[in-house]
From Swiss-Prot:
Function recorded in the entry: Allows the formation of correctly charged Gln-tRNA(Gln) through the transamidation of misacylated Glu-tRNA(Gln) in organisms which lack glutaminyl-tRNA synthetase. The reaction takes place in the presence of glutamine and ATP through an activated gamma-phospho-Glu-tRNA(Gln).
A Pfam match: Amidase
Record protein name field: Glutamyl-tRNA(Gln) amidotransferase subunit A
InterPro entries tied to this protein: Amidase, Amidase_CS, Amidase_dom, AS_sf, GatA
Any single biological process term in GO: translation
This protein's encoding gene: gatA
Example of a GO cellular component annotation carried by this entry: glutamyl-tRNA(Gln) amidotransferase complex
Keyword terms of this UniProt record: ATP-binding, Ligase, Nucleotide-binding, Protein biosynthesis
Catalytic activity: L-glutamyl-tRNA(Gln) + L-glutamine + ATP + H2O = L-glutaminyl-tRNA(Gln) + L-glutamate + ADP + phosphate + H(+)
Quaternary assembly: Heterotrimer of A, B and C subunits.
Stored SUPFAM superfamilies: Amidase signature (AS) enzymes
Superkingdom field: Bacteria
GO molecular function, a single term: glutaminyl-tRNA synthase (glutamine-hydrolyzing) activity
Native organism: Bacillus mycoides (strain KBAB4)
This protein's record includes keyword Nucleotide-binding: yes
């Protein structure tokens, strides 16, 4: 039995009873990485020397009263979150040699909570992708079946947790990039409310949509991690001055009287039968615990995919303009003048998907097309947000599948961008609305690949979605299932 089969609270008891040490936890992580990483490929960079030194430092503090909330816990960090002195590439060749000189706010908070960073996790390049096949270095595989994708863009973050390489990880979610890989890998992933967690030090893809969040084995551990990283940050003007609740205290298991909305659009056309049936079965479980549900409509959801790709690509085209070979990152050797430097560095450094989105965004923002595309997409975004607010006026949470299907095979959709993009049709509306949502395991498809249940909450009401997710988790045994890697 792996130490990572235990929860944070259980591991803390073992540490305080001197049954294990922080060094034991760190060595467990690196031993597992040594055993499976050649197949999974979840990590881009390991930080073994510093992690072992940190473990020894923390071992001397075991039992101290001022220990952090996540004392001694090994964590992996998605490679678009900057780490001082630890290479951060965004899985892009254009940043292959980039070593940041500061920590992201979430990394500072993890250090204050006494975690141990094991390494940086693989992802789709600049967080653009749904399968991890867009990594500029190598693709991560799904620990449940290496022939299948782990999802994206936080595929490495989800796969590392599912494979038992770390206890938990950080990902980022722009259109589903935490929840979709969590569903595909049979783990728990939360996209917090926009502004709940500081984005300072997150390499921006789409600044109005990006949000950092936790990926864990259990809902309780997820609440622990969000507790540690939440809160206003003076370095991020978009972080919200909203009180952070006690997420752990909210895990009561009580859903009696809970009002659940189930959008008909989330169970209709484009959603596979396996995903639909798993959600209906989950609703029966919650009904048996005293909750009620009704079908509702989010009528503008059908426009979400087009709206998202116009807005996110427009923001990406602006954000990625800074990668020009002048200030940091890889610089082309094929240069005769400044224009060559810009053109060749970006042509050689960016992958095909990143180039595709930069071109789409540049077009949408160009003179003569701005009103027809970008401005109109912003107006539709407002309609989508209003749909959620109308539903939440009468219901506590919205529930549906996280993804239309279980994970698909490696290479199956890589040559068809539109089919690939459609994997996010159920997660994208949440980002456009800025509300929080969690994915928890809720079953398996015919290929024995995991399915996820998406629970969506009101703005800054992570407490309620944690309570519902935890109640469902404890009433079922899906969270006890492990990849047989």
């Amino acid at each position: 039995m792996s130490l990572f089969d235990h929860s944070v609270s259980e591991l803390h008891k073992k540490l305080n009873n001197k049954e294990i040490s922080v060094t034991d936890l760190v060595e467990e992580s690196y031993k597992r990485i040594s055993d499976v990483e050649d197949n999974v490929k979840a990590f881009l960079t390991l930080d073994e020397e510093n992690a072992r030194a940190k473990a020894k430092e923390l071992d001397a503090k075991i039992g101290a009263e001022d220990n952090g909330l996540l004392f001694g816990m090994p964590i992996g960090v998605k490679d678009n979150i900057v780490t001082n002195g630890l290479r951060t590439t965004c899985a892009s060749k254009i940043l292959a040699n980039f070593d940041p000189i500061y920590d992201a706010t979430v990394v500072q908070k993890l250090k204050a909570a006494d975690t141990v960073t094991i390494g940086k996790l693989n992802m789709d390049e600049f967080a653009m992708g749904s399968s991890n096949e867009n990594s500029g270095f190598y693709a991560t595989k799904n620990p449940w079946n290496l022939d299948y994708v782990p999802g994206g863009s936080s595929g490495g973050s989800a796969a590392a947790v599912a494979a038992g390489e770390v206890l938990f990880s950080l990902g980022s979610d722009t259109g589903g990039s935490i929840r979709q890989p969590a569903a595909y890998c049979g783990v728990v992933g939360l996209k917090p409310t926009y502004g709940r967690v500081s984005r300072y030090g997150l390499v921006a893809f789409a600044s109005s949509l990006d949000q950092i969040g936790p990926i864990t084995r259990t809902v309780e551990d997820n609440a622990y991690l969000l507790q540690a990283i939440s809160g206003i940050d003076r370095m991020d003007a978009t972080s919200a001055n909203v009180e952070v609740g006690n997420y752990l205290a909210g895990l009561t298991g009580d859903v009696k009287g809970l009002r659940i909305a189930v959008p008909k659009e989330y169970l209709g056309e484009g959603v596979g039968e396996e995903a639909r049936e798993s959600v209906l079965a989950a609703l029966k479980v919650l009904e048996g615990m005293g909750a009620t549900w009704e079908e509702v409509s989010l009528p503008h959801s059908k426009y979400a995919l087009a709206t998202y790709y116009l807005l996110s690509s427009s923001e990406a085209s602006a954000n990625l303009s800074r990668f020009d070979g002048v200030r940091y990152g890889v610089r082309s050797d094929n240069v005769n003048n400044l224009l060559d430097l810009y053109k060749n560095t970006r042509s050689e450094g960016f992958g095909d998907e990143v180039k595709r989105r930069i071109m789409l965004g540049t077009f949408a923002l160009s003179s003569g097309y701005y009103d027809a595309y970008y401005k109109k997409a912003q107006q539709v975004r407002t309609l989508i947000k209003n749909d959620f607010e109308n539903v939440f006026a009468n219901y506590d949470v919205i529930i549906g599948p996280t993804t239309p299907t279980p994970a698909f095979k490696v290479g199956e959709k890589v040559d068809d961008p539109m089919t690939m993009y459609a994997n996010d049709i159920l997660t994208i509306p949440v980002n456009l609305a800025g509300v929080p949502a969690i994915s928890v395991p809720c079953g398996f498809g015919a290929n024995n690949m995991p399915l996820g249940l998406q629970i969506i909450g009101k703005h800054f009401d992570e407490t309620t979605i944690y309570r519902v997710a935890h109640a469902f988790e404890q009433a079922t045994d899906y969270h006890t299932k492990k990849a047989s890697l």
